[in-house]
Curated annotation (Swiss-Prot):
Gene3D superfamilies: Kinesin motor domain. This is Kinesin-like protein KIN-5B. PROSITE patterns: KINESIN_MOTOR_1, KINESIN_MOTOR_2. Responsible for microtubule translocation. May be important for the organization of phragmoplast-specific arrays of microtubules. Plays an essential role in stabilizing the mitotic spindle. Required during mitotic cytokinesis. ATP binds at residues 134-141. Belongs to the TRAFAC class myosin-kinesin ATPase superfamily. Kinesin family. KIN-5/BimC subfamily. The lineage of its organism: Eukaryota, Viridiplantae, Streptophyta, Embryophyta, Tracheophyta. One of its GO terms (molecular function) is microtubule binding. It comes from Arabidopsis thaliana. It is found in: Cytoplasm, Cytoskeleton; Cytoplasm, Cytoskeleton, Spindle. Residues 48-390 form the Kinesin motor domain. The gene is KIN5B. Residues 1008-1039 are annotated as: Disordered. CDD domains: KISc_BimC_Eg5.
Length: 1039
């Protein structure tokens, strides 16, 4: 907070009449920056507003009524936890602050931990602000002011921030024995009006105006707040400040509410300004200025809970309005809004520099732990928590020169005296108060702008002078460096000359040493190569001996393998003979079984045909009986018709009764005839069904016999094919194993021969003359011996492989031929079986069609009889109904009916005869087809028997051929390699030892070499010849 009072305060006991001119801050001295500017740069960093939270204890009334506590404070972790449940809704929030003080905290601990560092900053020349914020009745005024001072002069334990800060400032300054001056102001903001609480009483004013002096609130050109009419009191001790604080507090507006017995109804600002003389190195005296603003805000108030009415309600509304504006300013600063509503309230205008300005600010948020104040407590915590994010840019106040300050104060005092004198004498210029105030404000703004520009000019000049000094310093350093560089170059040139001379001498010595070194190194290299060559030859000889031993071991393994092959082939021959015998027995059994099945099928076929012939004869006899019955019926009907015609002419009167009786007799006769005809037709139908079942049974039996024959033939084929495949696979595996064995032997022999020749040739080229001659002879003999042995073995293996391959190829051809013949036979058998099946199916289909035709015709006859019976019944019924009415007409039409009846029975007779003839023909045709089917089946059976016999003969011959060829291949043609007498015997080789080779080395004397090196060094030092050469030091060769 930065505001300027209008009038310079009075010394004690001396009253000064205030003038209309505002107080002007003394002009700064034009001077060069000092070391204090570094601290200004350090302090220009942004810092957050410090927020301290204090929770008051529950009051006595709250404790008596057992009000629940909803706030818990953790001072160590600096946390405040709000935990409460309202209508099944839980409130659980956690807040972190810079410092937290619980209900049991003391005034001294709060001041020492939170406020004392701020007072130190004030004494360092900064402007600082401390203000209390919170709900009414939470202890803001108690925190800022505290209890009354004791008479003895010591601060009580209840003393607040303001008295403790005053005592701290005075104690620090007195301890430093500093030269200082201090001024204080105390103002009140009530209902948006600023009043001076330290103003003197005036008898010309009313009792209300004596206590309240209005203060004008304005802003200068830089945005700082200017308070017109505010007086400053100069103080010399802490007791003076305590007295002023008690006097101003007594004038402050308070009231009794339900929440607080002494509730502050206004905001108060107590400001302490201190000027301290600073010690300097020269004669110049500087003064640093510090300012401490202690603000006690009125508490936010709930009108319903506080019981405020009328004027108190308006006061509460203004208080809440100003605090709400303060909250909006805090939100705008936290959210970095482009517009901050400072001008919405005088409170925020006064605190403008403390919130986001150049002042260090500390907020003390006070809350109540009671559940009744939960809403206000949460609001206070939210605003305080958001205020933590406000950033200020603290700047130390500019230091002043004491002489300039005294001069300005003297000029100001003289100007004020002239104004007082002019006012008494009424000799001066009088203008409107508003115009004068505006001109003074503009004048002050211009003066401050000029001062700012002068300060910037001074800073620029100081920087220019600083850079000039720096340039001169760097120039001097550059001259010194150039002189040093010249000396270094001269020394470097002399050192290079000496280095060249030393290099020439060094090169001459090195050339001599190189000659000796080359000679010794060549001798050493030749000796080393000889020893290495001898070692290599010895190693090669050892390898050759090992290889020969391996060769003999391999030959022993080959003999063992040949014996194993012979035993394996014998075993294979016995297994092959046993498998062929089993195959022959299986084929003979299958053939005999097939012959038996064919005979059974033939017997079933003969029995079926005989039974079918008997059934056909029976059918013919039944059809004849049916024809006789029908013929007798027709004859009876004709006789009856003639009798009716004779009696018709003589018995017309008795016609009714006689016709009725005759009709009944005709109905009975027709019913009997129909019954007999139905019985005959049913017998025919049953007989045909029996014939159909017998035919189907015979066909199924024949088909099952053929299927069994086909399955047995397939089983014979599969077993034969499996045996032949096994024979072929075994023979092929034997051939492949022998071939792989021979190839492996040949490859190993070739590799050994090539390796041995290469080693021998390499040894011949590298060995010395004598050793080379001995080794070449030994190598040539062994090479010839191994080549002969390997060539003989290879030729024998090739011949044996050819013979085995030819024998196995013959066996494979025989097995393949037998397999092909068997496959052809199976294909033929399958074709015959398919044809037989088709023929049987066709014959069955024909028989079924004939039987269905017979059944259809029998059903037609039955239907015809039923139709005739139904027509006669209908005619009789109609005739009975019309008999009484049409007796005479019936006599006339009797002849006509007789003719129709005769023609109808004639047509029926003819139709029945034709159908009976057709039935006889169908039965005869079926019988003929059965005979043809019998002949075909007998031919097929005879063919199958012949083919089975032929298969048996061919199979026996093929098995005999396979057995003969296997016996010839495995016993007669198989030969075993007989090479034991031709194989060379194992001989021992004399290999020289390493010690005998090491004895060939030439011994060198280390002393002789050392003497030669010493003499060479002395000679090279004396001569000093040669050019510079980058050579490594000479090393001893034999190390």
């Amino acid at each position: 907070m930065s505001f300027t009072p209008e009038v310079v305060s009075r010394k004690s006991g001396v009253g000064v009449i205030p003038s209309p001119a505002p107080f002007l801050t003394p002009r700064l001295e034009r001077r060069r920056p000092d070391s204090f500017s570094n601290r200004l740069d350090r302090d220009n960093k942004e810092v957050n507003v410090q927020v301290i939270l204090r929770c008051k204890p529950l009051s006595e009334e709250e404790q008596k009524s057992s009000v629940p506590r909803v706030i818990s404070c953790n001072e160590m972790r600096r946390e405040v936890n709000v935990l409460h449940t309202i209508a099944n809704k839980q409130v659980d929030r956690l807040f972190n602050f810079d410092k937290v003080f619980g209900p049991k905290s003391q005034q001294r601990s709060i001041y020492d931990q939170a406020i004392a560092p701020i007072v130190h900053e004030v004494l360092e020349g900064f402007s600082c602000t401390v203000f209390a914020y919170g709900q009414t009745g939470t202890g803001k005024t108690y925190t800022m002011e505290g209890g009354m001072r004791k008479k003895g002069g010591d601060l009580p334990a209840e003393a607040g921030v303001i008295p403790r800060a005053v005592r701290h400032i005075f104690d620090t300054l007195e301890a430093q024995n500093a030269d200082y001056s201090m001024k204080v102001t105390f103002l009140e903001l009530y209902n948006e009006e600023v009043t001076d609480l330290l103003a003197q009483d005036d008898s010309s004013r009313s009792s209300e105006d004596k206590q309240r002096k209005p203060i004008s609130l304005m802003e200068d050109g830089k945005g700082s707040v200017v308070l017109r009419g505010l007086e400053e009191e100069v103080v010399y001790s802490a007791n003076d400040i305590y007295a002023l604080l008690e006097r101003g507090s007594s004038k402050r507006r308070t009231a009794d509410t339900l929440l607080n017995k002494r509730s502050s109804r206004s905001h108060s600002v107590f400001t302490i300004t201190v000027h301290i003389k600073e010690e300097s190195m020269g004669d110049e005296e500087l003064i640093k200025c510090g300012k401490l603003n202690l603000v006690d805000l009125a508490g936010s108030e709930n009108i319903l809970r506080s019981g405020a009415r009328d004027g108190r309600a308006r006061e509460a509304g203004e208080i809440n309005k100003s605090l709400l504006t303060l909250g909006r300013v805090i939100n705008a600063l936290v959210e970095h809004s482009s517009h901050v509503p400072y001008r919405d309230s005088k409170l925020t205008r006064l605190l403008r520099d403390s919130l986001g300005g150049k002042t260090k600010t500390c907020i003390i948020a006070t809350i109540s732990p009671s559940a009744h104040s939960l809403e206000e407590t949460l609001s206070t915590l939210d605003y305080a928590y958001r205020a933590k994010n406000i950033k200020n840019k603290p700047e130390a106040n500019q230091k002043l020169s004491k002489a300039v300050l005294l001069k300005d104060l003297y000029l100001e005092l003289e100007r004020m005296k002239e104004d007082v004198r002019a006012a008494r004498d009424k000799n001066g210029v009088y203008i409107a108060h508003e115009r004068y105030t505006q001109e003074e404000v503009e004048k002050k703004a211009r003066i401050e702008r000029i001062e700012q520009l002068e300060n910037e000019l001074n800073l620029s000049e100081s920087e220019v002078s600083k850079f000039c000094d720096l340039y001169e310093t760097e120039k001097e350093k550059l001259l010194d460096v150039e002189s040093d560089l010249k000396d270094c170059k001269r020394n470097l040139h002399n050192s290079n000359k000496d280095l060249l001379d030393l290099k020439e001498n060094y090169i001459q010595v090195v050339s001599k040493l190189k000659e000796k070194e080359v000679i010794v190194s060549r001798m050493k290299a030749s000796e080393t190569s000889l020893i290495d060559r001898a070692k290599g030859l010895r190693c090669d000889l050892q390898h050759a001996s090992n290889d020969i031993n391996s060769l003999f071991t391999r030959l022993d393994q080959k003999d063992k393998l040949e014996s194993d092959n012979q035993s394996m082939l014998l075993k294979f021959g016995s297994q092959l003979d046993q498998n062929l015998k089993d195959l022959h027995r299986t084929v003979l059994g299958s053939v005999s079984q097939q012959q038996q099945q064919l005979r059974t099928m033939e017997e079933h076929t003969h029995s079926f045909l005989a039974h079918k012939y008997d059934a056909t004869r029976d059918l013919e006899s039944r059809i004849g009986k049916t024809s006789d019955t029908y013929t007798s019926g027709i004859a009876a009907l004709k006789e009856l018709s003639e009798m009716l015609q004779k009696k018709a002419s003589s018995d017309l009167e008795k016609k009714n009764t006689s016709i009725v009786s005759q009709i009944e007799a005709v109905e009975k006769f027709l019913t009997t005839s129909a019954t007999e005809a139905s019985a005959v037709a049913q017998d025919i139908h049953n007989l045909l069904n029996d014939q159909k079942k017998l035919l189907a049974l015979a066909a199924r039996q024949q088909e099952q016999g053929l299927v069994r024959s086909m399955r047995s033939a397939q089983e014979i084929s599969n077993s034969t094919s499996t045996i032949f495949s096994n024979i072929y696979n075994q023979a092929h595996d034997v051939v492949e194993a022998i071939r792989a064995s021979q190839a492996e032997k040949s490859r190993q022999l070739d590799a050994f021969e090539m390796k041995f020749k290469e080693e021998a040739e390499r040894e011949e080229k590298q060995a010395l003359n004598d050793i080379s001659l001995i080794l070449s002879k030994l190598t040539s003999k062994k090479t010839a011996m191994i080549s002969d042995a390997s060539s003989n073995i290879r030729e024998h293996d090739i011949q044996e492989e050819k013979r085995l391959y030819e024998q196995m190829s013959g066996m494979q051809q025989v097995s393949i031929g037998a397999k092909e013949e068997l496959c052809d036979y199976l294909k033929k058998e399958k074709t015959h079986f398919t044809e037989n099946t088709i023929a049987s199916a066709e014959s069955i289909t024909v028989m079924d069609s004939y039987l269905e035709d017979c059944l259809g015709r029998a059903n037609d006859s039955k239907t015809l009889w039923e139709t005739t019976e139904t027509g006669i019944k209908n005619l009789n019924t109609k005739y009975q109904q019309e008999l009484n009415v049409t007796m005479e007409d019936m006599a006339k039409e009797n002849e006509k009916v007789q003719d129709e009846f005769t023609s109808t029975f004639s047509s029926m007779d003819a139709n029945f005869v034709s159908r009976t003839n057709e039935l006889h023909a169908a039965v005869n045709d079926s019988l003929m087809q059965d005979r043809e089917n019998k002949e075909t089946t007998e031919a097929i059976v005879e063919t199958c028997m012949n083919q089975v016999t032929l298969l048996q003969e061919n199979h026996g011959q093929a098995v005999s051929n396979i057995r003969n060829k296997a016996e010839q291949s495995l016993i007669k043609d198989y030969q075993v390699d007989q090479h034991k007498n031709e194989t060379p015997k194992k001989q021992s080789i004399n290999v020289p030892s390493l010690d005998s080779i090491e004895e060939m080395r030439t011994l060198f004397s280390q002393n002789t070499l050392s003497e030669e090196h010493t003499s060479l060094e002395k000679i090279s030092t004396k001569q000093g010849l040669g050019e510079a050469n980058n050579r490594t030091p000479f090393l001893e060769v034999n190390k």
